[in-house]
Amino acid sequence: DDSDLTVVSSGAYWTIYRNTANGEYSMRMFGNVPSSRPTAWNSYLKSIKHIEIEEATLTGSFASYFRNNVFTVLESVRIERSNLSGVTSFEMAFYSPTLQKVIIRDNDYPTAPSLRTTEYMFGYTHKLTELDVSGLDTSAVTNMNCMFNYCSVLEELDVSNFDTSSVTTMRDMFGSSGKLEKLDVSNFDTSSVTTMQAMFYGCTSLEELDVSNFDTNSVTNMSYMFYNCAGLEELDVSNFDTSSVTNMYGTFVGCNSLEELDVSNFDTSSVTTMQAMFNACRALEKLDVSNFDTSSVTTMQAMFENCTGLGELDVSNFDTSSVTTMAYMFDGCTSLEELDLSNFDTSSVTTMAYMFQNCTALKSLYLDNFTTPKTMTGMFTGTTALTYLFASHNLRAFDGLANTRWYDEKNWVQFSNYKELQMYHEYQREPTGYRKGVFLSLTMDAMGGQFEDAEEQKVQNKVSGEYWEEVVPVKEGHYFDGWYLDRNFTNKFDFSLPVAVSTTIYAKWVENYTVVIPASISLNEATELKVEGINRGSKTLSVGLNYEETTISESNKLTLSNTADTTVQCLAPLSWDGSETNPKNAILTLAPGSEITEG
């Protein structure tokens, strides 16, 4: 009520009042308002709580004008129906933790606006709950750094009509304004912007944010751009032109509600840092970075740390030749089951500390070209599900790897603990694959026979659940009658059962059948074919020969099969009249379908 206001001081463009009802001080400004503050205000600066500027013309720089180090208890500022064309700066103008309300509306710009910077204009206004900037012409502004930084309790902010066509920097523009629930930046012209660093940093309450029309062609810095935007469920950055971006440090860190994020078209050829780029994007189940050009990247520290929902991740095309740090790179990726880093060039890497820490679902890991870095503390800590590790011989340690039984999958060397594995790997001269667990052995005793390598024993190594391979040996004058678990041949071995225990099996042999054919035979003449044979087997010999399917070897032997059981076979030595001068008679001729049967 104006009736309670008493004038305590006044000047050409200002009046200071005291409210007799509550004892509060306020000030009104009007007319031509310069950017300087008269000394007459000094005794009231620590008392004035409200400032109203109406029908005034402001000229010059109003940087830090209403700041808390000047007006120490200021709670509200209202600028209405005033000419703001001559204002050149509002930098830190309202930078005050005591301000609760700022209204800038219905103002005039009879000439082109002079305002060039709004940096920190409302920075650190921790108590600001009401803000109207509809009367602010930003068409000439080039610097909006931290403009609304730390508007900690502000829930509503309308910047939909901002003209940002001249803005070159938006660093931390809305940073740490954690209570903002809505923010319409869909019409922002960002064609001149070079930095968007931390632009939406800590906007934890935003559930929607439309940046799909952002022109990022000139942007070089996107570090922390969406840091901890924990409420965002959707974010369309698929059209971002990132060809000029050099810094993607923490770009999406903490966006833990995003279920999808399309960065497949990102041009990362100029990016030098991807540290923590996707850190704590916990809801992401897929992330396509297969086309990333990482040839300029020097740090990938914590790049995918705590991406707990990722079930797969293709980084096989990453060029890591310039990377110096991979510490924590996949730390906490608790859903990843396989990582193929076989193409990683780690020759420049100095630290891999905790690189795979707590990748609790990781089963297979390929480190074909890794080299030993200066620091690898806890590199494999928490990889409890890891059952297969293929590692370069130039990677000399596996710090944090499960202290359990492993074995060399190629040479079948068993290690009872991590220390034995470590010592063994130090002497390798080529990449080696290791499997967790105990391997089982099948010893195959040929019992007087031989395998293809002329050995009388063959040993297979498998792990539980796999299947043994049946290998058939040979023995002069005998045919093979199967594998048995005992030397008495009473318990036949079953290859169709999965591997369960180590064991030895024995080959059973049966002496061959002997068939003697008369010296002179011909099926094309009347000469009777006679066969003399001795059957030393336990089954009836029934031999069928077909010219189209059977040939005679140089050793003059035919393989005869038992028709009742084709797995039973024997070699039939042949002899006949013939000589070098009569080669025709040295050829055994059998008509198609002809059979030889002897009981």
Predicted regions and their residues:
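Secondary-structure capping and domain/repeat boundary segments
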Residues: 438-517
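Surface-exposed interfaces of beta-sheet-rich extracellular modules
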Residues: 68, 404-415, 466-495, 570-579
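Extracellular/surface-exposed low-complexity segments
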Residues: 1-13, 388-442, 482-484, 509-510
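Serine/threonine-rich, repeat-prone extracellular segments and beta-strand-based repeat modules
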Residues: 416-434, 486-506, 559-561, 587-591
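Extracellular/surface recognition and adhesion modules
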Residues: 14, 29, 51, 339, ...
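Short beta-strand elements of extracellular/lumenal beta-sandwich folds
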Residues: 525-536, 558
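Acidic, Ser/Thr
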Residues: 68-69, 381, 447, 469-477, ...
